[in-house]
């Protein structure tokens, strides 16, 4: 049977696959995440997910490789992972009291087929005080997350409303992924 390989070192994606009962191994993709000239946020995340999966699939062509990428957008501005605490603070100030979009793209590659898709989720933040932002940034949690917050962690207290797939905001739209894996004859719902 073909193995499923997750081309990501994200502990959140690993946890979501485990929770869903998807058997997998991890081989971290070494692809540099650079955003070129794309027409839309959905194109960006699907392209980056495909680049990550393709890099790992080159040496694992007999298996199924999953790649994923997540970005946050606000008013056409792309908010990736912050490069430092000052940038994290700036992003949180920007998102305070507003609705933003989270896009997660997924690529599934096998020898005979490639599937890419994305999910878009709207997230609305409460108005945040400077003290809340400073304390959160000091916790270091936002420093490795797109948009500078983790909805599954301390950042959850900032969320007033969500419209769409919660797990996509965490980093992997697991329900959709499980359905897409059926195209590759993998059905974890009966495992």
Curated annotation (Swiss-Prot):
Name under which the protein is recorded: dTTP/UTP pyrophosphatase
Keyword list, A-Z: Cytoplasm, Hydrolase, Nucleotide metabolism
Superkingdom per UniProt: Bacteria
Transmembrane segments: none
Function: Nucleoside triphosphate pyrophosphatase that hydrolyzes dTTP and UTP. May have a dual role in cell division arrest and in preventing the incorporation of modified nucleotides into cellular nucleic acids.
EC number(s) on file: 3.6.1.9
Catalytic residues of the enzyme: 69
Cofactor: a divalent metal cation
Cellular component annotations (GO), alphabetically ordered: cytoplasm
Keyword Repressor included in the entry's annotation: no
Catalytic activity: dTTP + H2O = dTMP + diphosphate + H(+); UTP + H2O = UMP + diphosphate + H(+)
Location in the cell: Cytoplasm
Family to which this protein belongs: Belongs to the Maf family. YhdE subfamily.
A GO molecular-function descriptor: dTTP diphosphatase activity
Biological processes per GO annotation: nucleotide metabolic process
InterPro entries: ITPase-like_fam, Maf-like
Site label Important for substrate specificity, positions: 12, 70, 152
């Amino acid at each position: 049977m073909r193995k499923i390989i997750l081309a990501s070192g994200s502990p959140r994606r690993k946890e979501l696959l485990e929770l869903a009962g998807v058997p997998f191994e991890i081989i971290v993709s070494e692809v540099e995440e650079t955003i070129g000239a794309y027409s839309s946020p959905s194109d960006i995340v699907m392209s980056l997910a495909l680049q990550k999966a393709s890099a790992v699939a080159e040496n694992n062509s007999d298996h199924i490789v999953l790649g994923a990428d997540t970005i946050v957008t606000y008013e056409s501005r792309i908010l990736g992972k912050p490069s430092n605490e000052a940038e994290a603070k700036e992003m949180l100030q920007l998102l305070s009291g507003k609705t933003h979009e989270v896009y997660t793209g997924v690529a599934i590659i096998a020898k005979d087929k490639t599937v890419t898709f994305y999910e878009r989720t709207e997230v609305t933040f409460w108005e945040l005080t400077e003290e809340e932002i400073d304390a959160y940034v000091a916790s270091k949690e936002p420093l490795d997350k797109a948009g500078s917050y983790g909805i599954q962690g301390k950042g959850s207290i900032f969320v007033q409303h969500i419209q769409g797939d919660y797990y996509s905001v965490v980093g992997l739209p697991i329900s959709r992924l499980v359905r897409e894996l059926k195209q590759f004859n993998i059905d974890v719902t009966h495992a």
